Amino acid sequence: MDVSLQLYSINQETKKDFKKSVEKVSEIGYNGVEFAGYGDLTAAEVADLLKETNLYSVGSHCGLNAFTDTFEETLAFNKTIGSKYIICPWAKVDTKEEIDTLVQALNAAGDIAAEENIKVGYHNHAHEFVQVDGKYALDIIAENTNDNVVLELDVFWVAYAGIDPIEYIKKWGKKVELIHVKQINENKANVDVADGILDMKKIKEAAEYATYFVVEHEEFDKPVWDAIRNDYEALSQM
C-alpha cells in the first residue's frame, strides 16, 4: 500500500517546525503528504521541500472559500507543488440549499482544475449522513457532482455515523479515489490503525478505484510520532 499522511495529524509539530516535521514524515517511510496549510512557505519552497524529502503531494485541504473566492490562486499553488487533488474538508450540508451551493462550487472548480490535470474532491465527516429530502447529504453530493469531483472517504467518520465503510465504498465505486485511513474503536475514539475495529485490509480491497490511502490521526494516547510510526508500520505490512 502506498501510504501518505495528512499533515493535520501532526499540526502541533508542524506549528513548531514545519520543515523538520515533514522531513520526519519522510524518514518514517511515508510516500506522500496531504496538506492542511503550508507553514507560511511559498509554493516554490513547498515544492523544494517535497523534492528534498522525496515526498509527493497527494493534495491540499482547502476551505470552501478557496473554491468560491480564490480558486485561481489555490489552483496555481497546488500546480506548483504537484498536487493531484484539491479537497474541501468540510461544509455545511444541513439543507438542500447548502448542498446545492457546495455542489455548484465543486463542479465549477473541478472543471477549471481539470485543465491542469488536477481533480477536486470532498472529504466527509459524520454530519454528511444527515437525511436531506430522504437521502444522505453525502449521497446528494456524490450524485450531483461531475466526473472531475471525487470523494475522499474518511472511514472513521463513516463508521462514527453508524454506516459500514466497506459497503459505502462499494456503493460509490469509481467516485471514491481517496481513502482517509483513520481507525476507530468500540468507544468511537480515534486509535492506532492496529488497535481498532475497522479492517483496513478489507477497506483497501473494497476501494478498488482508490489510488491514495492517506493516514489521518487526531486523538493520541501516546507520543504523536509513536502513533504516526505505528500507523505506517501497520499499513506497510498489509
Regions found by a protein language model. Give the residues of each.
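Histidine-acidic metal/acid-base catalytic patches
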Residues: 1-27, 39, 79-82, 132-150, ...
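Structural preference for beta-strand elements that scaffold enzyme active sites
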Residues: 2-4, 32-34, 56-61, 84-85, ...
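A short acidic, amphipathic alpha-helical/loop segment
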Residues: 45-49, 73-74, 164-171
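Active-site acidic/histidine proton-transfer and metal-coordination neighborhood
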Residues: 64-150, 158
